[in-house]
């Protein structure tokens, strides 16, 4: 169950952060836009600034862009052989320090493909003002700790752990994808996912990584953002949802899967309880794409990663309408750089031509 929280926790673009950037000489509207950029993308297009402010391609817009560049706040990038169009990377560290994000990765250089992905996420946030949007790890953690009536263990939040011993570091919400939280009397939360490949291998891991948290959220939507080149992949993404949430494993399945994963990793294991189950048989039984995603999660969290696969809670959420999966096609071309998003994918195990892929 969830409870209402203060509005100040529902927005990463907070009045305090806007005020901090206004001290650099920006107007309130300019500062508000820049906080969106710093938190959600690190890069932006002139089109996005004009859409947010309602300004035309005129002197006010050009003055704002010129100020960013001449002051060293942002670097203009003119990609492509013809250098048509321009994106702006806001990399000035004092701006990030001013909003309490001195180590945010958005200020660092990245590939053009990654920049385009971030532009897409920024668009998705800017066009939907029905929700408050959270972009930083700390903002998400603070919100859910306050909003959930029952405290969740840290392991229930999406996370990745690196290193061992004193060098062990845990990053929460490592996908760095915006989360929309309800305002006023609504209870629905929106978890964005940007499709960067035709084959939804990473999406399967995303679903498993968020499954514990989703079971604790009263109403939720996973919104898959589809660049034009991937719009035909929606069926595969629906199939991935069905695998993750509509087909819970039995306790015996989980036990055998854990046994197989340990043997696959090279551990010395006792014979399986099923005398007919050997490594070759298990490899065939658990060859589908859903189990490859489960193996990736198991490598991170051991058998605990498999427990969520037994729960019928998310299946029940989807069947009752508490949970939804929706697809939003991104309409823009992004300086003709959309082909740089992701890489060509292969064929997932377990899918055959002509498979009926129901909508979740």
Region annotations inferred by a language model:
Residues 1-95:
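Basic, Lys/Arg-rich alpha-helical nucleic-acid-recognition elements, primarily the DNA-binding modules
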Residues 10-13, 57-60, 109, 113-116, ...:
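Non-membrane alpha-helical secondary structure
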Residues 23-25, 72, 99-103, 125, ...:
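Glycine-centered secondary-structure boundary/capping sites
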Residues 33, 68, 88, 124, ...:
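Generic structural hydrophobic/aromatic packing signal, biased to beta-strands
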Residues 37, 53, 65-69, 124-132, ...:
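Hydrophobic, Leu/Ile/Phe/Ala-enriched alpha-helical segments that form helix-helix packing faces
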Residues 90-118:
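Short, amphipathic alpha-helical interaction segments positioned at domain boundaries
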Residues 109-203:
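Exposed, interaction-prone assembly regions rather than primary DNA-binding/catalytic cores
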Residues 181-360:
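C-terminal regulatory/effector modules of DNA-binding transcriptional regulators
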